[in-house]
């Protein structure tokens, strides 16, 4: 028998301690990983609801199990809110992750062995955009495009590659690109070679929802996103379209269920519904505007301190710092900043001489630090502290600078808690 007062703390102290330690880590570290964000207590409440117990194979009104009347309400709420948020005609809220959403799109639109054209992982793409270690590069014949030495997409190069390889599908989107993608140009290229245009907007979905980054839906046949990252919801996936082709919509439905997944995670769909409602609130646009302002403010500090920023700036929530000129590695920078309670991730940069697990750069993102309430002055100060640590790498005062920076970080974390009590 279960009772409502059962707790993990009483039952599994080792697990409970890990949870408490993670709570403390998040409160005491400044999070600058571009793909991470803080979900609201409302989102987490939905994830912990009794919808955890419910199996609901199928779609609203067409379930394979009984007792789904409330699951139908939840899923339809999420669908309707996502349609309103992004201006979509078709929405599927069931994908468990962004990668599974992408797999469903491939399965719906093309066949095994068909050619796809996507952004190279080393140039800012994603594993699922055709990387050879991913299903997208194993099941399909993937051809990759990259960026210029200036860190920008060369659309003429994309066009030439498309004309040469004649892909069935072109993937636009990124995991580490700080500029605005010309969705219309990508569609023009796709139309020229008779390919589908598939956009993965996972990193910028929150900015798009707020109207601060171009919406790909008017241009793409199909769009996917995660529901965390800039969007700030639970970890999950989403498929959208406004192409007007009912046949494509039917294929997408069946490619998610039953082709790629069984029962949907109704508790996560409930959390997605909460997230979409939050994103429709007026203050959400202000938050996303501050995300971009903070990223731009940090970029200026890094440049003033002599560090190269890929593409010389940012128009979204992230940017890449290159250490090629300084002879530093992303791995060393990541580790040193981590000791100072500043969390980033090492990242390859254009013409990177280092191996993928070492790299010559870091990726910095501002969704989480902005969610804490940090303003432009706060993040300028933070970027300066980061440069202090980077300047000290390999020098006698390295540990002293790290220790001093950590104290400053702890102070700002105390002033701006993630979840104020």
UniProtKB/Swiss-Prot annotation:
Pfam families per the UniProt record, alphabetical: SHMT
Q: In which pathway does it act?
A: One-carbon metabolism; tetrahydrofolate interconversion; Amino-acid biosynthesis; glycine biosynthesis; glycine from L-serine: step 1/1
Subcellular locations according to the entry: Cytoplasm
GO function terms (MF aspect): glycine hydroxymethyltransferase activity; pyridoxal phosphate binding
Co-factor(s): pyridoxal 5'-phosphate
GO cellular component, alphabetical, reads:
cytosol
* Alphabetized InterPro entries for the sequence: PyrdxlP-dep_Trfase (IPR015424), PyrdxlP-dep_Trfase_major (IPR015421), PyrdxlP-dep_Trfase_small (IPR015422), Ser_HO-MeTrfase (IPR001085), Ser_HO-MeTrfase-like (IPR049943), Ser_HO-MeTrfase_PLP_BS (IPR019798), SHMT-like_dom (IPR039429)
Question: Site (Plays an important role in substrate specificity): which residue positions?
Answer: 228
Q: What is this protein called?
A: Serine hydroxymethyltransferase
Taxonomic source organism = Haemophilus influenzae (strain PittEE)
Gene transcribed to yield this protein: glyA
């Amino acid at each position: 028998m279960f009772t409502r007062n059962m707790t993990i703390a009483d039952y599994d102290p080792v697990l409970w301690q890990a949870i408490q330690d993670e709570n403390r880590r998040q409160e005491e570290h400044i999070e600058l990983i571009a793909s991470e964000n803080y979900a609201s207590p409302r989102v987490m409440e939905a994830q912990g609801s009794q919808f955890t117990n419910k199996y609901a194979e199928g779609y609203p009104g067409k379930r394979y199990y009984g007792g789904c009347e409330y699951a139908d309400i939840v899923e339809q709420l999420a669908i309707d809110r996502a349609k309103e948020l992004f201006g979509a005609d078709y929405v599927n809220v069931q994908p468990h992750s962004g990668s599974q959403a992408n797999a469903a799109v491939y399965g719906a639109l093309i066949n095994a062995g068909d050619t796809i054209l996507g952004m190279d992982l080393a140039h800012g793409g994603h594993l699922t955009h055709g990387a050879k270690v991913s299903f997208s590069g194993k099941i399909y014949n993937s051809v990759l495009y990259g960026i210029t030495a200036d860190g920008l997409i060369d659309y003429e190069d994309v066009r030439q590659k498309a004309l040469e390889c004649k892909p069935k599908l072109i993937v636009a989107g990124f995991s580490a690109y700080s500029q605005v993608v010309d969705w219309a140009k990508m569609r023009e290229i796709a139309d020229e070679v008779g390919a589908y245009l598939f956009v993965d907007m996972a990193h910028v979905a929150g900015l798009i929802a707020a109207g601060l980054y171009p919406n790909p839906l008017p241009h793409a046949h199909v769009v996917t996103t995660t529901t965390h990252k800039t969007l700030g919801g639970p970890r999950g996936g989403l498929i959208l379209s406004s192409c007007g082709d009912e046949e494509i919509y039917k294929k997408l439905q069946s490619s998610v269920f039953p082709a790629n997944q069984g029962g949907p995670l109704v508790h996560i769909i409930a959390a997605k519904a909460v997230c979409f409602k939050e994103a429709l609130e007026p203050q959400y646009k202000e938050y996303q505007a501050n995300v971009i302002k903070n990223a731009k403010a940090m970029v200026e500090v890094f440049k003033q301190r002599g560090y190269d920023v890929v593409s010389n700036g940012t128009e979204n929530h992230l940017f890449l710092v290159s250490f090629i000129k300084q002879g530093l590695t992303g791995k060393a920078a990541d580790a040193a900043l981590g000791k100072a309670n500043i969390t980033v991730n090492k990242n390859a940069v254009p013409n990177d001489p280092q191996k993928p697990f070492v790299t010559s750069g870091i990726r910095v993102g501002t969704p989480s630090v902005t969610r804490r309430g940090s303003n432009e002055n706060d993040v300028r100060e933070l970027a300066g502290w980061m440069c202090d640590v980077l300047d000290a790498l390999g020098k006698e005062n390295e540990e002293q600078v790290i220790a001093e920076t950590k104290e400053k970080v702890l102070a700002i974390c105390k002033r701006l808690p993630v979840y104020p009590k």
